Amino acid sequence: MVTLYDVARIAGVSTATVSRVVHGQDKVRDSTRTRVLEVIDQLGYVPDGAAQSLSRRRKNIIGLVCVERQSPRQQYDIESMSLLFYDEILRGVESRIRHHKWSLLITYLEEAGDPDLPRLLSLSGQVDGLLIGEGIVPSEYLARLAKRLPVVVIAGSPAERAADVVTADNRAGSAALLRHLIEDHGSRRLFHVDGPITAPDARERRLALNELLAANPHCQLVGSSQGLFSVASGEEAGEKLLAIWDEARPDAVVCANDQMAIGVLQAFAKAGVAVPEQVAVVGFDDIFPGSLYDPPLTTVHQPMRLLGERACTRLLDRIARPALRPKVELLPTELVLRSSCGCPPGTVTRRPVPPLRAGRSEPSAAPRRRRTPPVSPS
């Protein structure tokens, strides 16, 4: 088994320096830190003897690495995806580990900048396996971790090959929502509030939008705004749209998650824009606050608690059978129709979303025109 002494010897540094690098301490030169990390990667070193523990002294602990996103308007955005999304994930994970009488160790990594590899290496030495949230660790780092211990990515990219992935069928869910706007409400002009560039969920939802626009030439994207999956960034997107309202004038605002959709609704309410009479607003995720807003939010339900359950089950299977080949599990979504899209007040309709045929969004029939045209905000 590779030891801390082996790393120190090959890197040409003291064992104390290796320890400081592994634990993310600051008193190490950048060049030295880089050299030590390269040797750690080359040797496949796992701190704290975790590699031996996997085969001989199982700890019965798994780790969960969550994504922490901070809004530019608030140092601590209490409405961020980190809380509302991961609360349900945690409930699902906890239900499985409690059944197996295991324990859970939780940490948060900030999305900005490179992943904190020393911190992840240190965490890997304390657990039997890792659950990693939604794209916070790039594939090259993920491959390194997966060589050291079992790893499952929650809400990761369906194209991921370095580790197991459990995620919702985001493309199918987004395609169903967009078809509803076009076919049932006559939406032609769409404004998109996108999620973080690094978030696989946002990438899949964006792909569904691009495919739909390509298949439906009568529709057009009149503008877009990059958000952070937070209410504050959604409100900023709404303000951006209001500033170009006369030129953009969309039929519908398509948001990559519910928090941002709520932020857009807040911006519109302040400006006197009536939803859905002047413009439709839709989200994704089906978080509880969306159902309480006025108007209640049309969205796509992704089974967040089930994501946690299935990811935990897969990780425990991989810990027991390390030779399992990585696989991607897509969980089905549900279209949740309320009144923010233009459905009658009081509507609460749920429609299961089938997988996309041939992996692509299907073209729609020519949409009916919206009966009430959008007007400038007061």
Predicted regions and their residues:
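Periplasmic-binding protein-like
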Residues: 127-133, 189-193, 223-225, 245-257, ...
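Short gly/ser/thr-rich secondary-structure transition/capping motifs
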Residues: 42-48, 111-115, 133-135, 235-236, ...
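N-terminal helix-turn-helix DNA-binding module of bacterial transcription factors
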Residues: 1-61, 342-348, 355-378
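Flexible loop/turn connectors
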Residues: 243-363, 367-378
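Hinge/beta->alpha junction and helix N-cap segments in small-molecule ligand-binding domains
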Residues: 71, 79-88, 106-114, 166-176, ...
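Alpha-helical recognition/docking segments in bacterial nutrient-uptake
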Residues: 61-179, 247
